[in-house]
């Protein structure tokens, strides 16, 4: 008996130790902490320039550089590719801004807004459901999309850090000839060399202090990384054009699509690739594995997760459309020009910058450019979301939302124990534990499946746009997003909103034949099914948007149009409150007292 009591006491001490410190602005509960509460004005520091710098992290990445090469490899000409890029980027900017308004106007992220769509996760439902059904209850509502995102993000974290480690390996090989000549002490069955695993470990160590910074305090860091990334990629392009004495012949190569039908579908597929999936065709160099396939570009979560830091909604509007359309269209052109020049130099078009560095005779130039590429990869591993499309060889995964995104999702899942910082480190540890080189070498089917998840994520975009703009008409009751009492308008049926299920299923189920064919080409499907899968992102976006609007118009959810009378969480400025009709007299102390009461209620019901 004494042993049992002692064991229970140790568990209680451990439980108290892992809980977040309660000295923040918000009383901790199972629904809220400082990082997932509606952000107060003091934390909303992002200006237009911040958004330009933040989203430039992706636009100045190796992934975006190689996008043009992927489309040219699909038989489009360079200039047809650029038309597809500009049109695709324009559509992407529109979707990003529409979803970004959720965070910019109400200052909440994906895990919290998911409660409005799918239902609050009802920890306090012990009063209304049997205790033995706790597991089923916890998996209801907003937990589903959040768990899906976390799984994808952790895998993305693993692959992204591995790519960064390969860039570190290239730098060390350029600086230290002895490192380059180091004998490999690992067996072939390890699927990784000694040099590569050292570079991977160093990259993960470098990530630790970067992940420590809060998103609202990372502006200067991201600007510095963007400058180094842009300088490296610009330098590679200038060097290539200079040595080739021009852009070469590839830039003038005509399209291989001869009929108007095939050309039209090719351009449409290119636009779809830009909007929903972006490509990297990584070559078989010693430093970079050729792994990529489909991953959603416009994951609905990322936009509102970061737009909630905006000082005002207009900051995210200009910042995103300028970055998506202008900067996002320039880098694929740089990639096409460089590849055309390298074809004239080496007799082969090189689409992957690390490959160019690997064969460069200038060690100093390769090292400095490599540092820029590492900074780009490090920035991606911290903040951004990426995507890819069919590579010419091994299918894989790269650049899915990582770093801050996994921190925000885990914070939304377990707000009493995890904030953004802790979530980032949990994601880093889990990503390292996956040993990405093993997945790339021996789990081809797994990588293909996980990298094709854009078909499951794209409907979330349509559902978010429909729900916020057409159903709720941009009005939310924030206080009901942070409890699971039955009287809340987001409680629905036992914490679950069935209205979101059908639109999500319609958005991806018809794509399953093409999805299965992409994983196993031996599975034969019709041309129509294959084409529908190729256009999966716009189909998922538009179909889920239409069905969600129809279902909610026919079966309206409770509380449409309701908002809080008082500024419960101290969220709004005076101007925002006046525009919404919210009373600013309420204080954050009132909110804290309410949250403490709710926390006590949860404890009492569990006892």
Curated annotation (Swiss-Prot):
- Cellular compartments annotated: Membrane
Question: Basic and acidic residues composition bias: which ranges?
Answer: 592-607
The protein's matches in Pfam families, at most eight in alphabetical order, are given as:
Transp_cyt_pur
Q: Which GO terms describe its molecular function?
A: nucleobase transmembrane transporter activity
Disordered: annotated segments? 583-607
Q: Which GO terms describe its cellular component?
A: plasma membrane
InterPro entries reported for this sequence: Pur-cyt_permease, Uracil/uridine/allantoin_perm
Mind listing the UniProt keywords for this protein, alphabetically?
Answer: Membrane, Transmembrane, Transmembrane helix, Transport
Transmembrane spans: 67-87, 91-111, 152-172, 192-212, 221-241, 262-282, 317-337, 364-384, 423-443, 445-465, 500-520, 531-551
Topology in membrane: Multi-pass membrane protein
Q: Which domain of life is it from?
A: Eukaryota
Provide the function of this protein.
Transporter; part of the gene cluster that mediates the biosynthesis of aspirochlorine (or antibiotic A30641), an unusual halogenated spiro compound with distinctive antifungal properties due to selective inhibition of protein biosynthesis, and which is also active against bacteria, viruses, and murine tumor cells.
Q: Which family does it belong to?
A: Belongs to the purine-cytosine permease (2.A.39) family.
Q: What is this protein called?
A: Transporter aclS
Q: Which species?
A: Aspergillus oryzae (strain ATCC 42149 / RIB 40)
Q: What is the lineage of its organism?
A: Eukaryota, Fungi, Dikarya, Ascomycota, Pezizomycotina
What gene is it encoded by? aclS
């Amino acid at each position: 008996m004494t042993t049992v009591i002692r064991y229970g006491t140790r568990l209680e001490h451990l439980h108290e130790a892992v809980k977040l410190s309660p000295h923040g602005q918000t009383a901790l509960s199972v629904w809220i902490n400082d990082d997932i509460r509606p952000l107060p004005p003091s934390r909303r520091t992002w200006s237009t320039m911040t958004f330009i710098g933040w989203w430039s992290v992706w636009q100045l990445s190796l992934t975006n550089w190689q996008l043009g090469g992927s489309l040219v490899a699909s038989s489009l000409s360079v200039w047809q590719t650029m038309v597809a890029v500009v049109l695709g980027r324009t559509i992407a900017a529109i979707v990003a801004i529409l979803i970004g308004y959720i965070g910019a106007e109400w200052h909440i992220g994906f895990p919290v807004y998911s409660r409005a769509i799918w239902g609050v996760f009802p920890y306090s439902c012990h009063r209304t459901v049997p205790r033995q059904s706790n597991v089923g209850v916890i998996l209801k509502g907003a937990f589903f999309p959040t768990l899906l995102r976390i799984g994808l993000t952790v895998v993305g974290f693993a692959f992204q850090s591995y790519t960064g480690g390969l860039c570190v390996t290239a730098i060390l090989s350029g600086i230290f000839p002895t490192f380059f000549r180091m004998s490999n002490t690992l067996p072939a069955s390890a699927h990784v060399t000694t040099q590569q695993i050292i570079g991977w470990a160093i990259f993960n160590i470098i990530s630790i202090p970067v992940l420590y910074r809060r998103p609202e305090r990372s502006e200067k860091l991201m600007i510095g990384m963007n400058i180094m990334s842009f300088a490296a990629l610009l330098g590679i392009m200038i060097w290539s054009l200079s040595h080739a004495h021009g852009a070469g012949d590839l830039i003038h190569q005509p399209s291989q699509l001869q009929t108007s039908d095939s050309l039209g579908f090719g351009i449409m597929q290119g636009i779809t690739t830009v909007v929903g999936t972006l490509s990297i065709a990584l070559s078989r160099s010693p430093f970079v594995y050729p792994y990529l396939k489909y991953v959603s570009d416009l994951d609905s979560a990322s936009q509102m997760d970061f737009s909630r830091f905006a000082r005002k909604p207009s900051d995210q509007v200009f910042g995103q459309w300028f970055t998506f359309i202008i900067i996002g269209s320039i880098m694929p052109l740089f990639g096409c020009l460089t590849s055309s020049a390298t074809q004239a130099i080496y007799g082969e078009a090189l689409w992957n910058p690390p490959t160019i560095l690997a064969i460069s005779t200038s060690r100093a130039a390769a090292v400095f450019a490599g540092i820029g590429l590492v900074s780009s990869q490090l920035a991606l591993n911290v903040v951004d979301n990426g995507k890819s499309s069919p590579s010419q060889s091994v299918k894989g995964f790269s650049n899915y939302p990582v770093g801050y995104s996994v921190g925000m999702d885990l914070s939304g899942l377990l707000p009493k124990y995890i904030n953004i910082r802790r979530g980032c480190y949990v994601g880093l540890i889990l990503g390292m534990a996956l040993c990405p080189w093993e997945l790339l070498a021996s789990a081809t089917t797994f990588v293909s499946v996980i990298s094709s998840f854009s078909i499951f994520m794209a409907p979330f975009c349509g559902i978010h746009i429909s729900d916020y703009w057409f159903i709720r008409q941009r009005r939310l009751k924030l206080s009901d997003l942070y409890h699971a009492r039955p009287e809340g308008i987001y409680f629905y049926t036992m914490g679950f909103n069935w209205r979101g299920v059908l639109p999500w299923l319609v958005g991806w189920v018809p794509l399953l034949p093409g999805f299965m064919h992409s994983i196993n080409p031996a599975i034969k499907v019709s041309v129509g099914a294959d084409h529908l899968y190729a256009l999966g992102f716009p189909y998922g976006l538009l179909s889920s948007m239409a069905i969600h609007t129809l279902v909610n118009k026919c079966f309206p959810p409770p509380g449409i149009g309701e908002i809080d009378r008082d500024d419960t969480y101290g969220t709004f400025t005076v101007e925002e409150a006046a525009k919404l009709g919210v009373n600013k007299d309420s204080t954050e102390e009132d909110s804290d007292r309410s949250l403490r009461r709710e926390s006590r209620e949860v404890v009492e019901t569990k006892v």
